[in-house]
Amino acid sequence: MSSNGSLTKDEVVNIIKDWNFSWSIIFLLITIVLQYGYPSRSMMVYVFKMFILWLLWPASMALSIFSAIYPISLSSQIISGILAAICAVMWLAYFVQSIRLFMRTGSWWSFNPESNCLLNVPIGGTTVVRPLVEDSTSVTAVVNDGHLKMAGMHFGRCDYDRLPMEITVAKPSVLIALKMVKRQSYGTNSGVAIFHRYKAGNYRRPTIIQDEELALLRA
């Protein structure tokens, strides 16, 4: 460090070198999360992405509060206070909507910060819930050798002949029911089915009558 307290050129270069490795790892992780963080690609990466998104609200609010308490200037203090209030209101709204969705479905996917739509599919005596990123009036189910995919997401094993006749899409304010309108088999335990919206209302996801034999097979 120079006599006047400023950093020398060599010290700045050394600091950049030290942080360059850390930032390269951080940006690599961000790239992986953004590119593969979709439920149709990798559920593990998607859950990690949701965890990061969930932490951004309190982190943003904490930074804004810190900037408001220790401001650079009066204008920055005012702006930081406004940003902290906006973060708090949006975070509170997120929790309100998530709790409403949880009360409707009983699924922890309700606290997914990326989407407030949940696809509920009754399979084998239970209900499999997945986040639905894109809202649509119809959903396509594809069964390939006894493995079910809907909206590009894996739902586990399901025989084509045992596809449900009705599925639901839950939102904080409404539950949308979709019924099977068309199906076509194309091989052994394989086929395609299309579900289309036919009613909606302010009610909970219907309970599933447990099929003990199928539940044991899926366990």
Swiss-Prot record:
Q: Which residues lie on this side of the membrane: Intravirion?
A: 40-49, 100-219
Q: Name one GO molecular function term.
A: structural constituent of virion
- What topology in the membrane does the UniProt record assign? Multi-pass membrane protein
According to the UniProt entry, the coiled-coil residues are: none
A Pfam family assignment: CoV_M
Q: Which InterPro entries match?
A: M_CoV, M_MERS-like-CoV
Q: Which residues form the signal peptide?
A: none
Q: What does this protein do?
A: Component of the viral envelope that plays a central role in virus morphogenesis and assembly via its interactions with other viral proteins.
Subunit structure as annotated in this protein's UniProt entry:
Homomultimer. Interacts with envelope E protein in the budding compartment of the host cell, which is located between endoplasmic reticulum and the Golgi complex. Forms a complex with HE and S proteins. Interacts with nucleocapsid N protein. This interaction probably participates in RNA packaging into the virus.
What is the name listed in the Swiss-Prot or TrEMBL entry for this protein? Answer: Membrane protein
Biological source species = Bat coronavirus HKU4 (BtCoV)
The coding gene here is M
